Structures are given as structure tokens and as C-alpha cells.
Swiss-Prot record:
Keywords: Nucleus, Sporulation, Transcription, Transcription regulation. It is found in: Nucleus. Transmembrane segments: none annotated. It comes from Penicillium rubens (strain ATCC 28089 / DSM 1075 / NRRL 1951 / Wisconsin 54-1255). Signal peptide: none annotated. Residues 1-13, 92-121 have a biased composition (Basic and acidic residues). This is Sexual development regulator velC. The keyword ATP-binding does not apply. Residues 14-26 have a biased composition (Pro residues).
Length: 268
């Protein structure tokens, strides 16, 4: 048999190229949600019990929703950011405040032992006032892209020591990055002390769709901040670029201050 003729009769199968690895699996919708406190509260002046004496926390907390593996070119992801059924609520996360309230309840029970009803025994004044839940405020482009956080990634990078959503996305300054905010412009606190707020993301639609109780989709804690008595309050700060931009984009409830003219700012 001529040399090489056997290969024509019994050709060897061509080696197959290795199949490409499957694309990374996108996490479930619920696990994609994250909360990022874009603007931290720093200080506040303790306010009175009446609505006319409200003193908003300065600066007002601004919370942003982030999505794992968010793609700004994906209409599905953009629609998810624009879901009007999202809401973020807050509560006092300071355990010392809870202990103080328990002590106050014990004192009230002691006052009730004489059998005389008092108006201040039947009603407790909440320490926090303002809208307890905020609706989403969506913008097509982040008004302060230089401080915009990157959305988390499901692909871990060993060279990044911090979680992805804590890494600032400088590329956002070159892109029109959409964003959804929850802005607590009227949050006030009645008693002086050290506070820390817990923010929780929920979706009213989960109740409508499933008939079950509304789950907490994500949560975030603020940095500790101090609420001062009126005589010790250091004054209001100038508004941030983010706050000014959000007001220009239509969130009119924000009261902005600038050029060193913050209301209540003490003169040196």
C-alpha cells in the first residue's frame, strides 16, 4: 500500500478546539440589590415636638440603589432601576437609644402605679420625624459622576481588597450613568445624642405579586453622627454637588446652600 494511503481510507478525526467557558451566571434578582449611602449624615440640631420646629439632618442622607453586574446598555437593567414600587425606609439603629426608650417605659410604668392617668404617659414622642419611607428618584445621568460608586460585580478580583461597590468608578465621569436615589430631605431628630441610622430597601410589588409579606432586599448603615442641643450646634454646611444636581433635576424638596452661606453657620 502506498505510503499515506491508509490515512485516506481511515482518516483520523480532526482535533476539536476546546469549547469556550460558559458566561458567568447572573445572580438571582433579589441578590442583585445593594444599598449605598451616597451622602452620609454628619450632624443635626435637636428639634422640638412641633412640625414647625423641624431641623433637618445635615447633610440630608441620600441613599442609592446598586445592582450586581449592572449594564447601562441593558434596557432590562434600566427598567429595574426605574421600578416605582421600590421604597427605602429608615429606623434608629443606635442600641443606646433603644435602651433609653426601655428605661423611659419603665419610668412610665412606675408613674402609673398611683392609678392616675397622665397625658404624657399615654403617648410617646418618636425621636425621629419626617417621611419614614421614600420613593425612588431616577435620573438618566448621575449629577456627580466623579463621586459615583461602581456597581458591584459577581466576578471577584483578588487585586481588589474592598468590595466592588466601595470602589469609585472614575469611568462614570465619561459616561451618562443612570442612577436611582432615595433622598431623606426632611429627616429630623428630637433628642441630642449619638445616632446611627439603618436604611432598608423594599419593593411594594412583592406583596402584590406573591401575596406574602414584604422582604428586606438590602440594607445599609450610616456612619455615627451627633445631634446637638441648639446652643452647641456648629451650623449648616454648604450643599454638595450631588444635592445641588438632584435639585436641578427636579427633586425640589432639597434645600440647597452654597458659597459659604449655610443657614445657621457660625461666623469665625
Amino acid at each position: 500500500m502506498p505510503h499515506g494511503f491508509d490515512k485516506l481510507l481511515h482518516p483520523e478525526p480532526e482535533p476539536q478546539s476546546p469549547s469556550p467557558p460558559p458566561p458567568p451566571r447572573r445572580p438571582s434578582t433579589q441578590s442583585r440589590y445593594h444599598l449605598h449611602i451616597r451622602q452620609q449624615p454628619i450632624a443635626a440640631r435637636a428639634c422640638g415636638a412641633g412640625d414647625r420646629d423641624r431641623r433637618p439632618v445635615d447633610p440630608p442622607p441620600i441613599v442609592q440603589i446598586l445592582l450586581t453586574d449592572f449594564d447601562s446598555n441593558s434596557q432590562e437593567d434600566r427598567d429595574l432601576l426605574q421600578d416605582p414600587r421600590f421604597t427605602v425606609g429608615y429606623r434608629d439603629g443606635n442600641r443606646d437609644r433603644e435602651r433609653e426608650r426601655e428605661h423611659e417605659r419603665e419610668r412610665e410604668r412606675e408613674r402609673e402605679t398611683d392609678g392616675v392617668a397622665r397625658t404624657d404617659d399615654n403617648f410617646s414622642t418618636p425621636l425621629l420625624s419626617g417621611k419614614a419611607f421614600m420613593s425612588p428618584f431616577y435620573v438618566d445621568a448621575d449629577p456627580d459622576p466623579n463621586s459615583a460608586p461602581a456597581h458591584p460585580s459577581s466576578i471577584s478580583d483578588p487585586h481588589i481588597s474592598n468590595p466592588p461597590h466601595h470602589v469609585y468608578n472614575h469611568a462614570a465621569s465619561r459616561l451618562h450613568q443612570p442612577a436611582t436615589f432615595f433622598i431623606f430631605a426632611d429627616l429630623s431628630i428630637r433628642s441630642a445624642g449619638l445616632y446611627r441610622l439603618q436604611f432598608r430597601l423594599m419593593n411594594w410589588g412583592s406583596v402584590e405579586d406573591t401575596g406574602q409579606s414584604m422582604p428586606i432586599l438590602a440594607q445599609a448603615w450610616s456612619d455615627p453622627f451627633r445631634v446637638y442641643p441648639a446652643k452647641d450646634f456648629p451650623g449648616m454646611r454648604d450643599s454638595s454637588i450631588l444635592a445641588e444636581g438632584l435639585k436641578e433635576l427636579g427633586f425640589v424638596e432639597l434645600k440647597t446652600r452654597g458659597h459659604g452661606k449655610g443657614k445657621g453657620k457660625k461666623r469665625r
